[in-house]
A protein has these predicted regions:
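Gly/Ala-rich beta-loop-alpha elbow adjacent to hydrolase catalytic centers
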Residues: 75, 79
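Patatin-like phospholipase
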Residues: 2-74, 84-316
Length: 316
């Protein structure tokens, strides 16, 4: 009967099956057309944006449905959070459910101090609960997590050891969250050094870099509504000014339409995920071309501009 509640769910399920079959057909066709052709190592760079980062889940959904093999992931701020959970092995279906239940207080608590208005220590219990593994070495997909050394201003990239504190550091918005101390170094949000971590992804061996930029449209004619707007707009301006630095290391930039969402709009997770899906589907034709070309040769790789090296962490 028209209007039956389960009908829409059934239709969506059928559409998902059709897309999966179509993706499998394309994959088999590629293999038949070019047997033994090495597929370039595709890396995914997930930028920051707080609640807007839910759009990353939509991007990942499309990549999985279309069987696009992501070999390496690097994340900044919320991109590090989403990337860590995904690379640990949590299914996208589970990740989407988690996203719908998230609020600001899932990760943080208000605690006014000389260094910030909130602590993201609740992220420890959140990550302990949702991560399938707790160390970089055990991740199913290699992951780089960025942060910024507060004293030197240099970017730091984590690839080994415990995942939880590096993700906390990557999400530590200056002025909002307290800095995170790791091995004697005070670290803050990775967006200050790597708004979208394309350079670390290249250093990790990515031959094709797909960058996801959560471009915010800052207000030019109205006052900010709250602290989130002040800090979020400040970061958006900085990201825009630094765009030429990280875009040069990207082969393709995907920009979900998140301009109408606030940095604390966790309750709109469904809309944000959908925005990521729409943007990624528009970019699919270009990404599919990567699967039809051989992996980058050492000569071609050397032709790229030199990339800045992150500051090393001291040994344990």
């Amino acid at each position: 009967m028209p209007g039956t509640p389960g009908r829409g769910v059934a239709v969506k399920g059928f559409e998902k099956i059709v897309r999966s079959v179509q993706a499998l057909g394309r994959e088999l066709s590629r293999k038949a057309a070019a047997p033994g052709l090495p597929i370039p190592a595709i890396g995914l760079a997930l930028g920051g944006g707080f609640a807007r980062g839910m759009a990353h889940i939509g991007v990942l959904k499309v990549l999985e449905e279309e069987r696009i093999p992501v070999r390496i992931v690097a994340g900044t701020s919320v991109g590090a959070l989403i990337g860590a959970v995904y690379c640990s092995g949590l299914s996208l279906e589970e990740l989407e459910k988690v996203a719908h239940s998230c609020r600001f207080t899932t990760f943080a608590r208000w605690t006014v101090s000389r260094y910030g208005f909130a602590s993201n220590d609740r992220m420890v219990s959140f990550l302990t609960r949702v991560l399938k593994v707790k160390t970089f070495e055990d991740l199913r997909i290699p992951l780089g997590v960025t942060a910024t050394d507060f004293n030197t201003g240099k970017g730091v990239v984590f690839h080994s050891g415990s995942i939880i504190d590096p993700v906390r550091a990557s999400c530590a918005y200056p002025g909002m969250f307290l800095p995170v101390n790791i091995r004697g170094r005070w670290l803050v949000d990775g967006m200050l050094s790597y708004p979208v971590p394309t350079h670390p992804l290249r250093d990790m061996g990515a031959e094709r870099v797909l960058a996801v930029h959560l471009k915010g449209q800052w207000s030019k004619d109205s006052a900010p509504r709250n602290l989130f707007d002040v800090i979020g707009q400040s970061f958006a301006i900085a990201q825009d000014m630094m765009g030429h630095l990280w875009r040069g290391a990207a082969d393709l930039v995907v920009e979900p339409d998140v301009a109408g969402f606030g940095y604390d709009d966790f309750k709109r997770a469904g809309e944000l995920i959908r925005a990521g899906e729409v943007a990624m589907r528009q970019a699919l034709p270009e990404v599919r071309k990567w699967l039809e070309t051989p992996a980058e040769t050492p000569v071609a790789a050397k032709a790229r501009p030199a990339l800045p090296s992150p500051a090393p962490m001291p040994a344990d």
